Amino acid sequence: MVFNSIFFIFCFLPVFMLIYYLVPGKLRNLLLFLGSLIFYAWGEPVYVILMLFSSIFNYYMGTELERLYYDDRKQKINLIFSIIINLAVLVFFKYYGFLLNTIGGITGIHIPHPELSLPIGLSFYTFRNLSYLFDIYLSKVSAQRNFLTFAVYSTMFPYTSAGPIVRYTDIETQLKQRTINISKFGIGAELFVKGLAKKVLLADNLSILYSSICGHPQMSVFTSWLGILAYTMQLYFDFSGYSDMAIGLGKMLGFDFNKNFDYPYISTSVSEFWRRWHISLGSWFRDYIYIPLGGNRVSTLKHIRNILVVWALTGLWHGASWNFVLWGVYYGLFLLLEKFVLQKYLKKIPSWLCTIYTMLVVMIGWVFFSQTDFGALGHYLGTMFGIGASGFIDKTALYYLKTGFILLLISILMCRPAPYQYFKRLVRRRPVAAVIINLILFALSIAYMVYNSYTPFLYAKF
């Protein structure tokens, strides 16, 4: 089941919420667990067993890690065992074919293998459960003794499919006791509508524009930049839209999840961009990989190693393809370049120039991200810089600029905080007008969903 479907919005969600608000508080965790299983099993009837296994295994290993607190050696062995099992499941389903194809490419031997579908949300709930185990090992949190409470954390439907990667430490008390009321429900519903509109009205239309541009075998320089601008906006509104919907659903259920995006396209450096984009994933790699490796408290060479390792892994987390690894290393190199060379210069130039620099780096980065075929990747990058391009600008570019101008302009404006700050002021001064705007956005989104084909969330495949 997905958030941007008529069935979820008009069948599952209202029925579930009605029951959730009517049952006694002590039964809400049970209902949330069962509802999450139904939500997941609707699209993954077999792989729901895998998610249950992950919940049971990590619940048990969490209690074992706490039990062995005073036996450092055994506790460490159990942690390593937990990591191996969690990553083995992830590697088997997500990287199995990739590894065999890579080995075959190196050895020249074709290794036949069945194609495995990737369980929805596997990367997200694996990292979520690992963070729980790491925090127990680091004595940041106590193991949850009630399986149902842990299972709710592990399987909760708002963030199961595509994040955010919510830490147990952030919602530990809310899992046991949380406040639900009309005010919080309203805030959550508003966030959900905002995310739905981002996805359906902006991201899906930007996807059409980008796909149309990429369908041309020959492009001008301007066309290629226009295309990657559309993809840049699509990816942001698609993923931040999902995050808004997930956080909104959490509010409606009584939970307060941390924000996952903080207007990344206004950043004045690549480093700042990654403090604002997919915050839950970035903080996960920082806390559980980068810092344990020594972070920046080591020699310069080791510091460089740490950054490159973290970003290669970040790229690989996004997909079983070498273009994602290349994308991660690309960002690792830019972060190193900023830290050791560019930082002092970026402080001296106007912030708007820094933002342009950052967006150019990010847009080029999204080319690596979007093209899994190295031939297509090289061709697109070359076209952006005039290699193999059909001139600087042509009729095709002017056509897409004309047809996509309003969409791109709205997208660029909505990437900035100003429209949302204005809306918050409107809520305070004219709440009825704010409600009407939300209803219009909701109606437009539903109309678009009814009359157009379904487009999945991009990050659901990661």
Where are these regions (language model features)?
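Membrane-embedded transmembrane alpha-helical bundles that form the catalytic cores
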Residues: 1-461
